[in-house]
Regions:
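Bacterial N-terminal signal peptides that target proteins for export
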Residues: 1-7
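N-terminal secretory/targeting leader peptides
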Residues: 21-113, 123-343
């Protein structure tokens, strides 16, 4: 089914029923006009309006307009705001399993991550961690593999990671710390100045088209690949549970349909624009590089250690980690048989 067909089916259900529209203010962790990430919230808002026949609309606010970007979860939990738009991995400090659900280092491709989350039991596990906070989790937007980041120093050996000051989100930060780096999480609006002034040596954020909007190519020398830390990543709509429970089951299902349609949009919208943007960066003097195999091997080994350590500390993390490993194991034979060698 196409996205329009999915949404149309939900809209037909709502047709002919006069209801009072409800508008939810949504605090985003991203700038409202940011390509792909901010854009995704607007696509979701349109899809929800169509699917519910106008019964529910979203009014999206950019990062910092309602609450600071990294306070969105606590604000939704408390009821200060009804809903938020986020990268799931931002909340790993409060919800350990969110680090894994947001992005797994050396983890699944986008299609397999979507499969695990929506059909492989992933969402049911992760939701259990959100329940004590009174928050409904709706993973509505998946990001394709990201670059490894922007650097102002070359990474030729594992030793070059020692003392590296890097902004990185999710579990990737813990992996780099294990190899001697010093990492921190900063919101998008602070990254340019931090990199320009040398407070950090490197940063990652998202896809090339998103990074372009943040101006990194103006101040960083090297653009490294691959994005080992986020082969795929999840962004979500989070809704205060009292607000969510205030919707009838029919409307909840329509919102879920709109959410899944937005996942389809995110998978379709990501691949094509990136190559042209990378060429723009090269024309500006940025050097694109791949991490050496030695460095990737060390990052993979450290990632496995971190994943196992986190699983030992948190039962829900352990449950999710076992679940995703089982899902990938079952899919491995199929995917390996279907893989076509590159020329």
């Amino acid at each position: 089914l196409t996205c329009k067909a999915l949404l149309g089916a939900a809209a037909i259900i709502a047709a002919g029923v006069q209801v009072q529209a409800e508008t939810l203010d949504v605090a985003s962790t991203f700038p409202k006009n940011m390509p792909f990430l901010g854009e995704g919230a607007e696509v979701l808002a349109k899809n929800i309006e169509i699917a519910t026949g106008g019964e529910v609309t979203l009014r999206v606010h950019g990062a910092g307009d309602l609450v600071p970007a990294l306070e969105v979860l606590t604000s939704v939990s408390s009821g200060a705001i009804p809903a938020g738009w986020d990268f799931i991995g931002y909340w790993g400090g409060t919800i350990p399993v969110a680090s894994l659900a947001g992005a797994m280092p050396f983890g699944p491709s986008p299609d397999l991550f979507v499969g695990w989350m929506w059909e492989g039991g992933g969402l049911e596990i992760v939701q259990k961690a959100y329940d004590p906070l009174g928050v409904k989790l709706l993973p509505c937007h998946v990001t394709a593999p990201e670059p490894g980041g922007w650097f102002n120093k070359e990474i030729n050996t594992v030793a070059d990671l020692e003392g590296l000051k890097m902004r990185i989100s999710g579990m990737g930060g813990k992996v780099l710390n294990k190899l001697g780096a010093s990492t921190q999480l900063l919101p998008a609006g602070e990254l340019y100045v931090a990199l320009e002034r040398g407070r950090i040596d490197a940063t990652e954020f998202s896809l090339p088209v998103v990074d372009k909007s943040l101006g990194f190519a103006e101040i960083a020398k090297y653009y490294y690949f691959p994005g080992w830390h986020q082969p795929a990543s999840w962004n979500s709509l989070i809704v205060n549970m009292d607000v969510w429970n205030g919707f009838g089951e029919e409307v909840q299902n329509q919102i879920l349909t709109a959410c899944k349609a937005t996942v389809a949009w995110s998978m379709a919208a990501a691949p094509e624009p990136q190559g042209a943007v990378i060429e723009e960066f090269r024309a500006m003097g940025v050097e694109t590089k791949r991490f050496p195999d030695e460095v990737l091997a060390a990052l993979r080994a450290a990632s496995k250690e971190v994943l196992e350590e986190e699983a030992a500390k948190d039962p829900l993390f352990a449950e999710a980690y076992a679940s995703i490993q089982d899902y990938l194991s079952k899919a491995q034979d199929w995917t390996s048989l279907q893989t076509i060698p590159s020329e």
